[in-house]
Regions:
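Extracytoplasmic metal-acquisition and chelation regions
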Residues: 15-18, 35-38, 49-343
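Bacterial N-terminal signal peptides that target proteins for export
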Residues: 6-10, 14-37
Length: 343
């Protein structure tokens, strides 16, 4: 029974009642009989509509073709979801190249994309700033997963600026991103168990590629002389990278770009550059470069030349279709840029 037919039944019942009234069949006995019949018809109509509505609510809300619709906050998460999901998923990323997730505010369009998804993936650990409350609210009624949720807290770095409890930039340690990949794998299987075998196979292949990348980064960073193995960026996003690959990391701002910095922070970092003879600093694709330019100018005024070693991708990946537009390509680009500037 369709909703249209239900509405027609309502109309037919009304017309029958009206016709009989015109025919003079309006005795109390007749009215009681007609009332009983009307109630029975209404119950049948409502029960039919309820059954239909229940069937719609309980069925998978996949798009035509049976693909699982996934909305992910960051490009890194979206890329991992595509790798694991393969041909069975359609992935929409909210934050594109150059977007700072710490300062990001969801638009009405973003809310629609989240609402239309069968599965929502976000980083967690307060990376997404004000969007965190939206995710927590949606998780009460939808399939929403924080991909960092299964990482052992002992492997997480504490936030030194007090903005969050933990440093959310987990993707800079490839071994932690392997954990995230497994969480995404489990989320896809739960949402779409019919394709479990394919999700497991895709995840196994991607995890093997990530393991190779992890070893590659270790080898390349080790080629930098230890005295010059210092990575200086606009904000402290590379802490996990430093811990995992044995390179000292310093950022002008704290873990979140929402953290403010002052003239003393600039002068302190400038003085350290000069005293240690550090020859390169790095700008980030998602953070304005003026802070690094101020430090370079300050060092130059003290007779020390510091170069911009290149642009690193920190909180967002590169353009779609480029090597840096994938997680593996982004990590490889960052590593090669760092090694070339500091070696």
């Amino acid at each position: 029974m369709s909703v249209h037919r239900s509405k027609s039944s309502w109309a037919q019942a009304y017309l029958i009642h009206k016709r009989h009234r015109k025919s003079g069949l309006s005795s109390p006995l007749y009215q009681r009989i007609l009332y009983g019949i009307s109630i029975a018809v209404i119950v049948l109509i409502l029960s039919g509509c309820t059954t239909i509505q229940g069937a719609v609510d309980d069925s998978p809300s996949f798009e035509e073709g049976g693909k699982l619709r996934i909305t992910a906050t960051t490009g890194m998460i979206a890329d991992a979801a595509r790798e694991v999901g393969g041909e069975h998923v359609t992935v929409t990323g909210l934050m594109g190249p150059g977007v700072d997730p710490h300062m990001y505010k969801a638009s009405q369009g973003d809310i629609r994309k989240l609402d239309d998804a069968d599965l929502v993936l976000y980083n967690g650990l307060h990376l997404e700033g004000s969007m965190t409350k939206i995710m927590e609210k949606m998780s009460k009624s939808r399939h929403v997963v924080a991909v960092a949720e299964n990482i052992d807290p002992t492997q997480l770095r504490y936030s030194e600026d007090g903005a969050t409890e933990y440093d959310p930039h987990i993707w800079f340690d490839v071994s932690l991103w392997m954990n995230v990949t497994q969480t995404i794998e489990a989320a896809l299987i739960e949402a779409d168990p019919a394709h479990e075998a394919d999700y497991r196979q895709n995840a196994t292949q991607y995890l093997a590629a990530l393991n190779t990348l992890h070893q590659e980064v270790q080898t390349k960073i080790a080629s930098i002389p230890e005295s010059g193995r210092v990575l200086i960026t606009a904000h402290d996003a590379f802490g996990y990278y430093g811990d995992a690959y044995n390179i000292e990391v310093k950022g002008l701002q704290g873990i979140s770009t929402a953290a403010e910095y002052g003239s003393k922070d600039v002068s302190d970092l400038r003085n350290e550059l000069v005293e240690r003879g550090i020859k390169a600093v790095f700008v980030e694709s998602s953070v304005p470069s003026r802070s690094m330019e101020a430090i370079i100018a300050g060092a130059r005024s003290m007779g020390h030349t510091v170069q911009i070693g290149g642009e690193l991708f920190s909180d967002a990946m590169g353009e779609a279709g480029t090597e840096e537009g994938t997680y593996i390509g982004m990590v490889r680009h960052n590593t090669d840029t760092i090694v070339e500037a500091l070696k």
